[in-house]
Structures are given as structure tokens and as C-alpha cells.
Amino acid sequence: MGLLETIQHPADLARLSDEQLVQLAQEIRDFLISNVAQTGGHLGPNLCVVELTLAIHRVFDSPRDSIIFDTGHQSYVHKLVTGRQHFSTLRQQGGLSGYADRGESVHDVVESSHASSSLSWADGISRARVLNGEGDRYVVAVIGDGALTGGMTWEALNNIAADKDRRVVIVVNDNGRSYAPTVGGLADYLRSLRPAIDSLRTHKAYEGNLDWTKNKLQNGGFLGQLMYKSLHAAKKGVKDWWAPQGLFEDLGMKYIGPVDGHDQKALESAMQTAKNYAGPVIVHAMTDKGRGYAPARADEADQFHAVGVIDPETGLPLDPSTAQSWTSVFAEEIAEIADERDDIVGITAAMLIPVGLHRMAERHPQRVIDVGIAEQHALTTAAGMAFGGLHPVVAMYATFLNRGFDQLLMDVALHKAGVTVVLDRAGVTGPDGPSHHGMWDLSMLQIIPGLHLAAPRDATRLREELREAVAISDAPTVLRYSKGNVGAEVEAIERLDDGVDILARRPAGSTENDVLLVSVGAMSEMSLQVANLLGAQGISSTVVDPRWVLPVPQSIIELAAQHRIVIVIEDGVRAGGVGSRIRQEMRAAGVDTALNEVGLPVEFLAHGSRGQVLDRVGLTAQKVAHDVVAQVLGTKVPFARPLPNEQITHTGQFPTL
């Protein structure tokens, strides 16, 4: 039996010798490589925090002390030492989450995997501890150097530093990367830091003597105050020369480091020093992403930040896909557009390769800007670029648009800025769970005045709609598409004057217009399946793809008036989505056709494959067709209306689909 199998609780780590800790760290790395290779997941980030996580759990007392992992994707080692070693289920439906999850363990605190929030959590928890008379409990926040590029971290630091009695330990896991190398002035600053004599500077006696001297000199008249200012300036100068950590200490935070993030004894010493100080402290640990796994270290792109199923020996995908992904289609097309237009600039929030801007960056490096993990800043700087005569294309995951909503509304839309926002991983994304599903965007974007929203159904439509988007210079445009591979081309049988594509219509010779199926984006294949199932029951249907769902095309309203019921199929939340907007436009035009919104419930959806998640919520062709048949027959609301001069007979019976 290996050491790892004997660890079921953090307290089990206390009995291990130095030699056993080294052995355990190696066992953990071997375990992660072997298991994540079979399921996929965040491998590189977890290989770099093995010793760091062990040190935290040996010095602090979880769950009495709260341990928070910013973004949470580096919590695998934490899971292992808190009794969760069934990694064969990682990111599988019903299995272990790829992030922290309160439903799994009392040791998990923050479930959201959106970056830069951990310090605000730490601020709030530590305040609650003090107010509840539990100020002796620690809060440890583990945050990467990449997440420190998010402005929210500095808002939290401003508050944490103001209260010297709260026991907050901020562990900066500095591997020089988020997905890719961390960029910006902060990254340069962190690289400049040098070791210092932290055990002295963070000792309570040192602080006490410093305060006593300060008070005596400041109360000693003009000469005393002059002497204090001189000594303070000298101290600061020596400190910044010896260890230029002034940024943190000028905020009022004690700084320890940099510490070798793979030296177990040094890490534990640093953690113990921070604990003994019993106030806000930053521990700066230098780590290697992908530590101990040669294929990860050799991966220049992101050092195996996230992998699919791979050969653990070589790191190569076991089933390399030859299909084209949505992201790669965008990457090719935006690079070609940039070749043609000098005013096109790309903006990414620390995700150059994942969102597909790398090809444009290879050809036009001066016209692709990585702003760090800063979606709010990305959108407002885009508005400024548009004012300056450029056309910015801001590419991000759909789930991260939530963070920049105010900037999109007030800085971009209010000023009618010609900015294109490209949302990757829209809809249900699968294994990464509730905080990564891009299911909120369709509802959020409905309320932004003047915004144009496109949802391409295939690669050809993505290319053409991207070009249409960047041709608009007086309003924001948004494109959204799914995660993974693009499906087969879905050709239209007709394109209407306002750009709406007719994908299928009633058989020739039929005079019935029962159902109008409005397919949003990648739901076209399902919509056509629904039409086929309805046709087998003698129910006629027309299938349309609006292409641009905002503003609602006039032809959609006209077609709605010609049918008995409208079914809008979308992979966003039903509340306030595309279906809801079409209903409002229909009513405003005096069209009283029944309409049913088919989409996702307003719930946080647990992880699983895309197909499994859609099946759980009933968003399948079989279920949708079954409901539509009932609505046409008049046994389920909303009832399909009779058309003028049409007599409809309701049977009240359900056919078998």
C-alpha cells in the first residue's frame, strides 16, 4: 500500500516524516498523471501545487480554517488529501467535480471557477469570523499570479490590508502563467521580487518595537518627527533594494517570499511564519506548471493546462480529432479578416489560444492585446479603441461575459461603439459544470439597446456572420457558438430578404402550416430531427434559422402569423431568452400565435457530457417532439391555435414517437 492510500483526512499528514512527504508528493504526481490521462482535466496546474497544498494542510486546520482555491481547477491535490481519491469519476456525470464542490466535502468552500474572486471571499469570511467571535480561525486563499491581473483582487486587498487583526493568509502560486504566460506590469513586478529576512519582519516583537519607536519619535516634537521621517525613508529604501516587495507592504500587507514552491520544508516554514503573525500576510511561492511531467513541461502553449484523454507516457491524445472545432474556424476567419483590414484588433482576457486569437497574433502581433484576466477592462478598452477608429474583436468564453455586462451595456452599447464580442463555449459545455456553462448570455443580451446578436449553426455561417458583424461600425455585435467540434453543414433551402434561412418546410402539395420551429445556432440539427418526428405523425412544420436573433427579423413575425404554434429551440435559459423576445415582438405586431420557449431551466446544471446534461433537462428531439404533438392536439399548453377558416379536431390522444 502506498502512502497516498493511507491519507483520508488532512490530519493524517501530520505523522509523516520529511522523507515520507517527498514520497507522498511523488505518489500524488504519479496518481494525477495516470488518472487525469484517462478522464481529461486540469493536469498542469495541479502538478505544480502538490507541495504547496501539502504544506497548507500540515500547517492549517481544515475545515476549521477555511482554504479557498481561486478558480478551483488546482484543487485536485486538496481533494486527494481530504478523502476523495475516486478519480476515475472525475468530471463524469455523478462523479467528482473538476472544481471545489461543497456537496463533496466540508473542506471545500468556494465552488465558482471564475478567477480573481478568492480574496473577496477571504475578506468576507474573515470579517464574519471576527464579528462572530471566532477571530482565531484562519482563512487561506490560494491565488495564481494570473488571477492577480483581475481588478477584483486589488479591491479585496485594499480592504484586507486595512484591518491588521484578521487572520488572512494569501498564498500567491506564481508559475508565471494563467493559461499562457502571465502578461503586464504586475507579471514583470512579481518576477522582480527577491528573498528577504521575513521571519524577522513578520515577528510580533519586531512590529511592537516598530510601533513604539514610531510613537515616541512622532510625539517628540519637530526633531522627533524629522528623525522618524528620515529613518522611515531609509528603512523603505533598504527594504526595496533588498526585496522589492513594496507594492504589497505599501498596502499594509506583510510579505513572505519568494519561496521555492517545491521545497516542502521551506514552504511549511513560510506558512508557519505567516500563521504566527496572525494578521494579513502574503506568501509568495514560485512553482513550475506541469512539475514532474516532461510532456507538460515541454508544452510551450499552456504546459498541459487542460487535457483530454491522453497517453500518460507521451502526453499525446489517444484519439486525436480530425474534425474542425468552432474555435479553429473562428481562428482562421479572424486572421483572414485581419489580413484584409488594418483596423481589426483582437482582445483576449488571458486566453489567447483557447479562444482562437493566436493565429491572428502570429500574423499581426501588434494588433492582438492580452489584457490579463480582466473582462471588464477588455470591453471598455475596446470601446476606447472603437472611438479611436479601430474595430475591436473581443473573444472570451460565454460564461465570462457575465463579468463584463455593465461595461458592454454602458461603455460599448450606450456609446454605439463598433465592437464585436465573440463568445466561445456558449450553451451547455459539459464536464466543467455549472460555472462554465455558457447558458446566460442569450437572456442577458436581450436587454441591451441596439445590440446585434448572431448564433451561427455551422462553420459556413460562422464565417459569414463574423464578416457581417465586423462590417457594423455603429453598434455592438455579438457572435456565440458552442464548445467542441462543428457539426455537418446544414444547408438552407431558401434565404429570405432579411437574412433568415429556411431549413425545411411542409411537403409540396400540403396546405397545412402547423408548427414554426425557430432554431437558434447549434440547435439546428435537433430542430430538423423534431420536424421529422412531427412529420411522421402527420404534423407539418417549417424550420427556420434566424441567423441574427437580435434584432428579431421581421420575417419571423410574418411566418409566426401563418402557423398554429411557434416553438423556439435554444440552448440558453428559457427565462428572458430568444423565445421570450420573439413572443414580445409578436404581441407588439398583433400576432396571437401560441409560442413555447424550449431551452434550459433557470438552474445551476451539474457536470456531465453535453448530451447527458441536455437529456437531464429534457432538451432532446424526442421530448420536444412529444410536447409539440400534445400542444397541436390541444392536450398541453400552450395550445396550438386554429388558423383562420380552419377547423381543428382535437383527439386528446398521444401517438407513440
From Swiss-Prot:
Catalysed reactions listed for this entry: D-glyceraldehyde 3-phosphate + pyruvate + H(+) = 1-deoxy-D-xylulose 5-phosphate + CO2
Keyword list, A-Z: Isoprene biosynthesis, Magnesium, Metal-binding, Thiamine biosynthesis, Thiamine pyrophosphate, Transferase
Residues annotated for thiamine diphosphate binding in this entry: 73, 113-115, 146-147, 175, 293, 375
Cellular-component GO terms for this entry: cytosol
Keyword Lipid biosynthesis recorded: no
Gene Ontology molecular function: any one: magnesium ion binding
Cofactor note (record): Binds 1 Mg(2+) ion per subunit. Binds 1 thiamine pyrophosphate per subunit.
Cofactor requirements of the protein: Mg(2+); thiamine diphosphate
GO biological process, one term: terpenoid biosynthetic process
EC number of the protein: 2.2.1.7
Pathway note: Metabolic intermediate biosynthesis; 1-deoxy-D-xylulose 5-phosphate biosynthesis; 1-deoxy-D-xylulose 5-phosphate from D-glyceraldehyde 3-phosphate and pyruvate: step 1/1
Top-level taxonomic group: Bacteria
Secretion signal, residue range per the UniProt entry: none
Binding of Mg(2+), residues: 145, 175
Function noted in UniProt: Catalyzes the acyloin condensation reaction between C atoms 2 and 3 of pyruvate and glyceraldehyde 3-phosphate to yield 1-deoxy-D-xylulose-5-phosphate (DXP).
HAMAP family linked: DXP_synth
Assembly and interaction partners: Homodimer.
Family designation: Belongs to the transketolase family. DXPS subfamily.
Name of the protein in its database record: 1-deoxy-D-xylulose-5-phosphate synthase
Organism field: Renibacterium salmoninarum (strain ATCC 33209 / DSM 20767 / JCM 11484 / NBRC 15589 / NCIMB 2235)
